Amino acid sequence: MNFYKIFVFVALILAISIGQSEAGWLKKLGKRIERIGQHTRDATIQGLGIAQQAANVAATARG
């Protein structure tokens, strides 16, 4: 019975320590994904601006 309690306690300590070390790795991955999303958003906004300018030039050329 005592062995079981000690085993559970050690298992919990290991799970907590492994969980904390994994959080750093997961946080880095999350930041990379967030950065990719920001770059995609910025490129889309820039592309829409260029497309709007092209549409204005085409409309002006038609008269």
Swiss-Prot record:
Tissue specificity as recorded in UniProt: In the anterior end of the larval hindgut and in other larval tissues that are undergoing histolysis.
Signal peptide segment: 1-23
GO biological process: antibacterial humoral response; defense response to Gram-negative bacterium; defense response to Gram-positive bacterium; defense response to virus; humoral immune response; innate immune response; response to Gram-negative bacterium
InterPro entries registered for this protein in UniProt: Cecropin, Cecropin_insect
Membrane-crossing residue ranges in chain numbering: none
Entry keywords, A to Z: Amidation, Antibiotic, Antimicrobial, Immunity, Innate immunity, Secreted, Signal
GO cellular component terms, A-Z: extracellular region; extracellular space
Predominant location category: secreted
Outcome, altering L26W: In strain: Z10, Z18 and Z22
Effect of W25G: In strain: Z10 and Z22
Arginine amide sites (modified residues): R62
Keyword check for Secreted: yes
Induction: Induced as part of the humoral response to a bacterial invasion.
Function: Cecropins have lytic and antibacterial activity against several Gram-positive and Gram-negative bacteria.
Family statement: Belongs to the cecropin family.
Protein's name according to its UniProt entry: Cecropin-C
Gene of this entry: CecC
